[in-house]
Structures are given as structure tokens and as C-alpha cells.
A protein has these predicted regions:
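Terminal low-complexity/charged segments
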Residues: 1-194
Length: 194
């Protein structure tokens, strides 16, 4: 068992919900209520030293066809934290390791504790997740939109956000296709349908 998982199981035995590994990267899903404490532990534990917060991002698992989350998820949204333990040759701290910590967020209660007290660099990514997905970060000192206009209605990265569009006239006088007219290739197909 990898040291990150072993140390977390020891310190937070009731809070680890799911563990997976993909291409050498460990992904651990934890209880959202404990996220700040868990990240603080990962940052400050001498054996781990996850001292670099790379990013956090939102994921919407909604299947628009069924209205339910895909992949057997119990929740519609996730917030994923990407952490690194960078080695410092002068102090000997850090391990050159990457770790993904995830929290599930239900649609009817889209709130996660802020981690800005642990990693100051989470301030703007948390605001972006709020703006795009509508997930609020409890305790964040400036929880307002960062990309969309303040009076924007809705959250555009949600899979149930209505696709809009406006007619755009090109310099040669033609108009581009409407959203309804566009045919989007399936990611597994070539442009020639093969």
C-alpha cells in the first residue's frame, strides 16, 4: 500500500470512501466535511509533505439522457484536488509525488468547506468552480463570480445548462450553423465517420 493511503487510513479511518489508481496516480475520495483537515494533514505530515497545490476542479457526472449521475456515482458533482509533494534538495523534504483527493458533492446540497486556509492558491479555483458549477465553498472570504458577469443566470459548466448560441455573420455574408444544426463527432470517431 502506498504511503499516502496508509497514512490517511491511519489518521482518518472513517473518512476514506473510495480508492483507485490510474497510470500510477492515486485517487482517494474522502468525506467532503473533512476535506480541509485532510489536506492540512497531507501538507504538514513529515512523511508526506504535499506542499504544492496545483489546482482544484469541478466535475459534473450528470447523464442528460437519464437525469442521474453516470458511472454509478452517488452524487452528481465532484471537486478534485491535485496535490504534489515536491522534493527540496536543501532540506530533504518532499517526495516528488502526485496525489488526487476527491470529494463527492450532492446536487441538493452543493457546498464544500473551503481549503484556502490550507492552500492560499485555492482561492481563485474555488471561485471558478462556484461560477461554472454552482458549488459553494463554505468559509471562502470572497465567494462571487470570477468569469461570468455578476448578473449571469445559471452555471455554464453544468451538463443541464441550456445550450444557447447567437447567429454570427461572417465577413463574406454567410451565417454559421445554429447550435441545433451542428453535428458533433463522437470522440471515438474520425471526421470521416470511421
Amino acid at each position: 500500500e502506498r504511503i499516502e493511503l496508509a497514512r490517511l487510513r491511519e489518521a482518518f479511518p472513517e473518512d476514506i470512501l473510495e480508492v483507485s489508481e490510474f497510470r500510477g496516480d492515486l485517487r482517494i475520495t474522502v468525506r467532503r466535511e473533512r476535506i480541509a483537515e485532510i489536506l492540512l494533514f497531507l501538507r504538514d505530515d513529515p512523511a508526506l509533505r504535499f506542499n504544492f497545490f496545483s489546482e482544484c476542479l469541478g466535475v459534473d457526472y450528470l447523464d442528460p439522457a437519464t437525469g442521474a449521475p453516470i458511472l454509478g456515482k452517488q452524487w452528481r458533482f465532484e471537486v478534485v484536488y491535485n496535490l504534489y509533494s515536491l522534493h527540496n534538495p536543501r532540506t530533504g523534504e518532499g517526495r516528488n509525488a502526485r496525489l488526487f483527493i476527491k470529494v463527492g458533492v450532492p446536487e441538493d446540497d452543493p457546498v464544500v468547506p473551503t481549503v484556502t486556509g490550507v492552500y492560499a492558491g485555492a482561492e481563485f479555483p474555488e471561485r471558478e468552480i462556484f461560477d461554472m458549477f454552482g458549488i459553494r465553498f463554505e468559509g471562502h472570504r470572497d465567494m462571487r463570480r470570477i468569469l461570468m458577469a455578476d448578473d449571469w443566470i445559471g452555471h455554464p459548466q453544468r451538463k443541464d445548462y441550456p445550450l444557447g448560441g447567437e447567429r454570427v455573420q461572417f465577413p463574406d455574408g454567410r451565417y454559421g450553423p445554429s447550435v441545433a444544426e451542428r453535428v458533433v463527432q463522437h470522440p471515438g470517431e474520425s471526421f470521416f465517420g470511421r
